[in-house]
Design a protein with these regions (language model features):
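C-terminal cap/loop subdomain of S1 sulfatases and analogous C-terminal strand-loop tails that border
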Residues: 6, 16-87, 92, 105-106, ...
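Electron-transfer interface patches adjacent to heme c in soluble/periplasmic c-type cytochromes
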Residues: 8-11
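Active-site-proximal N-terminal segment of extracellular/periplasmic enzymes that hydrolyze or transfer
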Residues: 92-102
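Thiolate-centered catalytic microenvironments shared by cysteine-dependent enzyme domains
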Residues: 1
Length: 134
């Protein structure tokens, strides 16, 4: 971003498209609608070493969620099964650590960020055979 970001800088933070609107409103100096989800990335644009305080949420289909922070990816499927990957030691996600004793605290920590409410998939998507409710 001209005038904000140093040329050639980058950040390894996982971000979400929901963060774009609050970022643009902050950079433009206009109020953001509080009903809109997302967090401004302006601080990260100014200083790429800034770390996000919360993991990024990714949802695919109905009740299938993944959470990603600097080191970990936690996945929870609609059927209740789980996956956990340590990107520091396993960047290609070959070893699922869910169910192992040592990283259990990471699952507990990341689970706090799962959505409490899941909206029904769009009816049009269900008609095409996608996003079927279990």
């Amino acid at each position: 971003v001209p005038g904000v970001t140093e040329a050639g800088s980058n950040s390894n933070n996982a971000v979400n498209l929901l963060d774009i609107y609050p970022t643009l409103t902050e950079l433009a100096g206009i109020p953001s609608n509080p009903a809109v989800e997302g967090n401004s990335l302006a601080a990260m644009l100014r200083d790429p070493s800034v770390r996000k305080s919360e993991p990024t949420l990714i949802t695919h289909g109905f009740q299938n969620h993944a959470l990603r922070d600097q080191r970990w990816r936690y996945i929870r499927y609609a059927d209740g099964s789980e996956e956990l990957y340590d990107h520091k030691n396993d960047p290609n996600e070959f070893t699922n650590l869910a169910g192992k004793k040592k990283p259990a605290e990471q699952i507990t920590r990341l689970k706090r960020f799962l959505p409490e409410v899941n909206a029904d998939p769009l009816r049009a998507s269900r008609k095409r055979g996608k996003n079927k409710k279990p």
